[in-house]
Amino acid sequence: MAASQGGGGNSGGGGCGGGGSSGGCGTAGGGGGGAGGGGGGGGGTLVVPIPVPTLFGQPFPNGPPWNPGSLQPQHTVRSLDRALEEAGSSGILSLSGRKLRDFPGSGYDLTDTTQADLSRNRFTEIPSDVWLFAPLETLNLYHNCIKTIPEAIKNLQMLTYLNISRNLLSTLPKYLFDLPLKVLVVSNNKLVSIPEEIGKLKDLMELDISCNEIQVLPQQMGKLHSLRELNIRRNNLHVLPDELGDLPLVKLDFSCNKVTEIPVCYRKLHHLQVIILDNNPLQVPPAQICLKGKVHIFKYLNIQACCRMDKKPDSLDLPSLSKRMPSQPLTDSMEDFYPNKNHGPDSGIGSDNGEKRLSTTEPSDDDTVSLHSQVSESNREQTSRNDSHIIGSKTDSQKDQEVYDFVDPNTEDVAVPEQGNAHIGSFVSFFKGKEKCSEKSRKNEELGDEKRLEKEQLLAEEEDDDLKEVTDLRKIAAQLLQQEQKNRILNHSTSVMRNKPKQTVECEKSVSADEVNSPLSPLTWQPLENQKDQIDEQPWPESHPIIWQSEERRRSKQIRKEYFKYKSMRKSSSGNENDEQDSDNANMSTQSPVSSEEYDRTDGFSHSPFGLKPRSAFSRSSRQEYGAADPGFTMRRKMEHLREEREQIRQLRNNLESRLKVILPDDIGAALMDGVVLCHLANHIRPRSVASIHVPSPAVPKLSMAKCRRNVENFLDACKKLGVSQERLCLPHHILEERGLVKVGVTVQALLELPTTKASQLSVA
């Protein structure tokens, strides 16, 4: 149909003579012949000529629509040529967002290019023409398909800015870190590690390695003494390296990682203005501290550091305040850590307003440059002692053409030469004073360590002396007993020996109350450290001397072992000592141990630890006194008592672990103090016996004492309801103060021994 209409148009053109122009127009117009044919078909033999502009402005419905984008490639080519021409004259090459796969600048001289923007293209590798740009300082390769960085990049020895983010890099080559880079952006790649050679980038000020798969940061990052901004967001980091605490960071972003702890040494980041740590399972500091902001985080880190170094809370390490205000004394306020006003040369780094934080302007005066270099030099010396906070970024400011300037750019340049020398002198004197203070504190710490070691040695010597004294006294008593045995054999007949049991019974009845209650009596109860005046229950007069000596050596070794075991168990068992005593010894004296001076009043034997006297020790009455000593307070009986307590505590641990299927720590008293384990045990015996249990959370890992007491009281109430008798029920302080584990074990044992039928009846009721 269209072809026939076109034919009509052509024939009409031949008949009228005007069709020639119409047909000519159609031929020249590229599709106009079809339009003319349509016109001829509609108008018969008459064809109306249509001007060319009208054809483009008002396309006919039956013809193909005109697409203005058909001319776009010609404009793109012209704009690309124009960009290359401008790059040759200005040194700035901008080819961003052109979907280029190959570099088009083969016919242009671009060797003087200083800035090249090749971002948002489709380069699979860095164009080889770029390696010819010797003076290149800035290279932007953002959003391409680059997989590797060739070694030819070493030709760009003036490159300070490199952005190769959002590409397909899996590793960073070692030769990349031989360049004088100040800004390196390699985010949104597939990096799994950072080479150790990154420590060579002494001038690096900004590093962005976010959105990768990095698991560990190298320790060599602590050598980046000029680093101001570090972005390690969205990686797989579990631990932050301690070396970052020595850097002069202004911004730190480690969000969206797996970090659980901020190192305490990060309290030295006194220039830090922005810290982003969200989306991390942080435990130290706790979540409620992190939500309060930067100041509270640093305060928490300072308190933790003081606790670890056994310092007082009023000796917090606040050197940043003294650096910002050398003429003002230090205070304990953590709010001064980051003042809102500018002080001294720290105009941008020490403020929170975010303005003028990173100034890239070069000092306009030689005195300003010298001041900056002097401050940086002093800071480098302090950094080597791990006690400084870096203010400058480099030692030589003239070498760095784009350093971060810490002098307020709004300050008049005229005032700098007048005050430059004063600033230099004040800072140098301040740092010298700081060195002296650090030396004094170091000496004080050394003296404290020496004193602590001396005290420990004295305590160890005292313990050894006590043990030696016990063994010496036993030897003396052994000699006296041997002498007594010889005298008895010589002076007494066989009939006297037959009546010995009867005399022993009479002597036991004749012990006076004065002897029992006397402060020097051998029956006086005393702690184990002074068990020198206690008697062993072994029948000494009946033993053979040689057998007794071998037995004595064995006992002395056993005493030494039990002595140190007792000291470790004394804290947990001290609350139960009075409860375990026999009723016959309830009224005995509990006075302080007898001093060594009292032993020497009568040649060391008048009140000997075995109740023996120098000459009357061989008489019958002294033997009766010796035989009447209560064996319940001997050292061996005390050791047996401690072994029983340890066995009960072990049984308590086994009961809890077997019933609850958990593993308790070595310090079982601390594990039971909050009452959570005991409440779970009660609910295990009878469900819902404890309605509510206060449990710790990751944000608050330790319960308050009020909540601990509430848990303990709920547990004891549940025990009463379940049928535990009052005699076998422990008291709250036995659990809360960790001093009655034996009583707690009795209560738990009673709870487990309840009949199942009774427990089921109670649950039904």
From Swiss-Prot:
Domain Calponin-homology (CH) residues, every copy: 642-755
Any Pfam family matching the protein: CH
Per-repeat ranges for LRR: 89-110, 112-133, 135-156, 158-179, 180-201, 203-224, 226-248, 249-269, 271-292
Transmembrane region(s): none
Spans annotated as Disordered: 1-39, 55-76, 316-401, 498-552, 565-628
Claim: Lyase is one of the keywords in the record: no
UniProt keyword Repeat, yes or no: yes
Function: May play a role in the organization of the cytoskeleton.
Protein name (Swiss-Prot/TrEMBL): Leucine-rich repeat and calponin homology domain-containing protein 2
Organism in which the protein naturally occurs: Homo sapiens (Human)
Source taxonomy: Eukaryota, Metazoa, Chordata, Craniata, Vertebrata
